[in-house]
Amino acid sequence: MSERLFIFDTTLRDGEQVPGCQLNTVEKIQVAKALEQLGVDVIEAGFPISSPGDFNSVIEISKAVTWPVICALTRAVERDIDVAFEALKYAKHKRIHTGIGTSDEHIKYKFNSTREEIIERAVAATKYAKRYVDDVEFYCEDAGRTDNEYLAQVVEAVIKAGATVVNIPDTTGYCLPQEYYDKIKYLKEHVDGIDRAILSTHCHNDLGMATANTFNGVMAGARQVEVTINGIGERAGNTSLEEIAMILKCHKGLGIDTNINTTKIYPTSRMVSSLMNMPVQPNKAIVGRNAFAHSSGIHQDGVLKNVHTYEIMDPKDVGIDDNSIVLTARSGRAALKHRLHVNGVDLEEEKLDKVYEKFLVLADQKKEVNDADVLMLAGADTADAHAVKLDFLQVTTGKGVKSVASIGLDIAHQKFEAAASGNGPVDAAIKALKKIIMKQMTLKEFTIQAISKGSDDVGKVHMQVEYDGSLYYGFGANTDIVTASVEAYIDCINKFKESN
């Protein structure tokens, strides 16, 4: 009989720490519902004391999902734990995730403390959280660089204090796979009472070993893994949920199963990528667009003769539909709703109406609208909610002449117009926009991505600007790349307005 591995998803907490990937509460609920359908056991919904937005998101996610455990992160601080419990009040299944740094680097430089005092604080935090909930997870931050003997003392102490799960993070992504295996194995063999708690992995990808370390941790006895969709996360990211799930599905002989419905992996990946404006690299394992593509003649010949010559997974096992429906201007609202549902997105009727209006405009500009376009439309911010909107844009450009742009903006229902010339159409359009906004934001990053294939593609522009020492991120999408660029800049302006 197979052993059960619990999947703890931290896309909405650790994953959302990526610059430019912040979600609003409605989007977080959308992701949480998709994670529930995917079959994750635990959803880390946020760090409630960090901001009112995180606090509110944990509350609303707790209301929106039914069977997964909803987890809230805290430091080993009583006030953090108080606030976390308040945020979890509507959760059907609650978990508080508290902890403290245990490496000598953290003890000395972060806390200016001693090993003995850290254990005292760890025990106190665990006992305090236990007053609120039965399910308490304790994290030993930077466990990867904590010596095993001291780490075992901390783990034993918090289990005695009531921890039901103990998280052993490779916070800096420093561990080698064998080293991480040995660490988990050491704890399994040297901690008194280890059977009263589940050991959890939480590995970062700074050296590209997050999945290998997580897998080795499972082989050594960990029975919870902390992962994110697409491996997103701080710095180089976290262990990918899809990689661990499919490793275990492909290697059934290991005798370890998860509750993941793998056919939901690809739709969930696409939805998260779209909402967070973070493209999945083409060669990403499991969910990259090239993951099941074959360009070598030898490989193509083999696959045509028998798919198992070069494919160890059926694309349908991860939810890739080779017979994806292409929508046109004649497609109805029901067809759009169906394609969104297939891709893991279920919208309320009012939002669906607005997305359908955008779809019709796009369908008039393109011959065909595919799934990537549909997800882009669903993930785009609703313009009606923004203080600044693009009314019109006209650009004149050509070889050997300066580009000229005229732009019209609607700002809080007041109309403004301006014109400017520049070195190219995008430069001219942004200069005209700046004449109206009168805020000299500095462009720090500008990237263009094709959403799909073809000369009538939707182009997606990601932009980062700096104003008064703060960074703001925006994106725009349109079949016209100049319009997409202006929309991205306007998105940055609206993000600035929202935060101020």
Describe the residue ranges of each PLM region.
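Alpha/beta enzyme core
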Residues: 5-7, 17-42, 55-64, 78-199, ...
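Non-catalytic terminal/interface segments that mediate subunit docking, oligomerization
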Residues: 17, 22, 30-31, 368-472, ...
